[in-house]
A protein has these predicted regions:
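Membrane-proximal intrinsically disordered regions of secretory-pathway and membrane-system proteins
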Residues: 1-255
């Protein structure tokens, strides 16, 4: 192979396999088909291996992934915030594709539907439900830092920082979003409603992840999981209530 004496990329003098200036590999100056194919495989591996390793690790041993990331092994795994946002985007796309809003709020039956007040309440409820379905993923993402804040306030024994609790919450809830997306897809062809198991699977997964991350007994881990679950649901309810109040205020002011 005819290797160049100077780097074709930055024109620096070459002394080895890689350029000391820009890092480009010292290969033949003439482009070959093998080089193109090898470059594709190299870049695919660089792009996909961390995400594949993260997905697999969070599936089989979520606590270990979180501990290793916190300990400094960050090159091996996808950034937790990036992972959570990516999983939320996948869940949003699946819900749009499958026609699943993910919520079933029915407040239109309050009171007597023949009265003006009931009609007004029904209209507010419908608008709230519609907007809530549209922004549910954002509410999910906003709830995760609050869950991490709760963990930071409750689990003081191991002296973990808020950022470490946040990385744990982002990873586990990101993976829960991904598992939800898979269950929504599988819900159509399977004769039983798989989505009804989501709350139970969430509690089991949170308990398992907390047990691996915080190294406490299974009972403490289950308690942390229940607190995480309640905090997350409570924040979603609060966000929905705030949204309803905003819609009500707009209707009262502008008619």
């Amino acid at each position: 192979m005819d290797r160049p004496e100077r780097c074709p990329n930055c024109d620096a003098e070459l002394h080895g396999v890689f350029c000391n200036s820009c890092g480009q590999k010292n290969e033949s100056s003439r482009l070959s088909t093998g080089e193109i194919a090898g470059g594709i495989l190299e870049h695919v591996a660089e792009l996909d291996l961390p995400i594949v390793r993260t997905v697999w690790g969070l599936t089989v041993n979520p606590g270990r992934v979180c501990l290793e990331y916190v300990a400094g092994h960050r090159k091996r795994f996808t950034n937790p915030m990036k992972y959570c946002f990516l999983a939320a985007a996948i869940l949003l796309a699946v819900r749009a594709w499958m026609g699943s809003g993910g919520v079933n709020i029915n407040l239109s039956t309050i009171g007597n539907p023949d009265t003006a007040m009931s009609e007004f309440a029904s209209e507010i409820a419908q608008q709230t439900t519609s907007l809530f379905s549209q922004y549910l993923n954002w509410f999910n993402l906003l709830a995760v830092p609050i869950v991490a804040l709760m963990l930071w306030g409750v689990i003081r024994r191991n002296r973990k920082t808020y950022a470490e609790h946040l990385s744990f919450a982002l990873y586990v809830y990101g993976h829960i979003f991904l598992l939800k997306a898979i269950l929504i897809v599988l819900d159509r062809p399977v004769p039983i409603r798989l989505t009804v198991f989501i709350p139970y699977l969430t509690l089991v997964y949170l308990s398992w992840a907390a047990w691996g991350m915080y190294r406490r007994s299974i009972w403490w881990s289950m308690l942390y999981a229940v607190l995480m679950f309640i905090t997350f649901i409570l924040m979603i309810v609060i966000f929905a209530s705030i949204l309803s109040l905003i819609i009500l205020a707009i209707r009262l002011v502008f008619g």
